[in-house]
Amino acid sequence: MNRILSRAQMRAFDRHAIDACGVPGVVLMENAGRGATDVLEREVLGGDARGRRVVVVAGLGNNGGDGFVLARHLLLRGADVRVLVVGDPARFVGDARVNVDAFSALGRSFETVVLREPLERALADADAIVDALFGTGLDRPIAGLFASVVEAINAASAPKLALDIPSGLDADTGQPLGVAVRADVTVTFAHRKLGLCTPRGAELAGRIVVADIGVPGSLLGEETAAFTFDAADAARAIRPRPSGAHKSSAGDVLIFAGSPGKVGASLLVARGAMRAGAGLATIATFRDAAERLDARVLETMTATIDDADAAESLEDRVDALLARRNAVVIGPGFGTDAKARAVLARVLERYPGPIVVDADAITLAAREPELLAPARGRLVLTPHPGEA
């Protein structure tokens, strides 16, 4: 799993690297800019920067400093680099000023943007555009000349690389602060930022590449905003089976799912459980859905919740189904009527193991949050935006 950081966590990470580990800020900036150069050359320029026209649009903060590091490394790789600074260059300070001076020491100058039209002409000739205007620290809407610059970048036809985060994107919410750069590639430093993982943020960021800046992730301790979880993580989470393993030794999953018109939901869950390594999976559903289910399953078993002996109550039937299970899923396509509610309440009250609460079960819990209070097992809720 890879960590996802909020704006405050990334700021603390940088500060800890500087104060506790003795890594100067100028070194972090150098590593970030050099890593971004590698990404630009590989992902945008086809593996060779020589002779390519690159326009770097830089702000006055550390993101602009990263842009100057990138511009210097591009020059050393034979690119035709043009740096356009938005704002008064006299306001560069600290590590950013060091890298502005290092770029100038190569005998190259930069230009200052004061009007949109000259900027548009410069961008029209570019093979690639680097957005180094604002980084993760931006927390107010972009306006005035800066908004015009972002609009000009977006209107240009050349592919765009954003440094750390597209300028104008809120690093926490993933929403544009007024206007935001629409990048083709975003190279984000050290760790993904929370805003890049929202639907709108991911759309504006384009392809996201994480660049190492030479600081171990262990500096974060356990605190992080979120984690990524991909196919490789899932594969690592499945324990290797011993040579003598059989279906009863690999986990037994009970799935309360499916109703008329939504039988497919139960089949998808069962397929996922088996693919994740379960040895046994049983779909428990009501009689009217079970009749549509039996002919469609192969390795999954089925059980009918309301088709037991007439003397057996619904609660007793649920208890019998729960016996000796290793995990329970409840909710996909299950319905939200009184019977479904009664099953959910019983499962939460009686089952001590892990319970995935999904779909219709989340809807029921949202209507009556007190349903979750007596839960004995560890709950995993998986809402989509309409259920969250």
Protein language model features and the residues they cover:
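Small-residue (G/A/S/T)-rich helix-start motifs and N-terminal tracts that mark the onset
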Residues: 1-86, 93, 185, 196-355, ...
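Positions that flank functional sites
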Residues: 89, 118, 168, 288-289
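Short, conserved catalytic or adaptor-binding loops enriched in Gly and charged residues
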Residues: 100-107, 179-180, 200-203, 372-373
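Short acidic loop-to-helix transition motifs that present clustered carboxylates
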Residues: 115-118, 165-171, 194, 310, ...
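A short, aliphatic-rich alpha-helical micro-motif
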Residues: 123-127, 153, 180, 322-323, ...
